[in-house]
Each structure stands twice: as structure tokens, then as C-alpha cells.
Amino acid sequence: DCCYGRVNGCNPKMADKNYE
């Protein structure tokens, strides 16, 4: 939830989930 896309340097899997 704290991640929105890989640009934030979050976990790729989590980033993808929140980005989509």
C-alpha cells in the first residue's frame, strides 16, 4: 500500500500490485 510503482524503489511484486 505504501508503494506506487517501481520508481519508489519498492518491491517489484508489491509495486506492480499497487501500480495496477
From Swiss-Prot:
The enzyme's E.C. designation: 3.1.1.4
Keywords assigned by UniProt, alphabetized: Disulfide bond, Hydrolase, Neurotoxin, Presynaptic neurotoxin, Secreted, Toxin
Annotated cofactor note: Binds 1 Ca(2+) ion.
GO molecular function annotations of the record: phospholipase A2 activity; toxin activity
Record PTM text: Contains 7 disulfide bonds.
Main location: secreted
Catalytic reactions on record: a 1,2-diacyl-sn-glycero-3-phosphocholine + H2O = a 1-acyl-sn-glycero-3-phosphocholine + a fatty acid + H(+)
Enzyme class: hydrolase
Cofactor(s) of this protein: Ca(2+)
Localization (cell): Secreted
Tissue specificity remark: Expressed by the venom gland.
Cellular compartments per GO CC: extracellular region
Function: Heterodimer: presynaptic neurotoxin.
SUBUNIT field: Heterodimer of an acidic subunit (CbIalpha or CbIbeta) and a basic subunit (CbII). The acidic subunit (CbI) is non-toxic, and increases the toxicity of the basic subunit (CbII).
Similarity annotation: Belongs to the phospholipase A2 family. Group II subfamily. D49 sub-subfamily.
Protein name as it appears in the record: Acidic phospholipase A2 CbIbeta
Organismal lineage: Eukaryota, Metazoa, Chordata, Craniata, Vertebrata
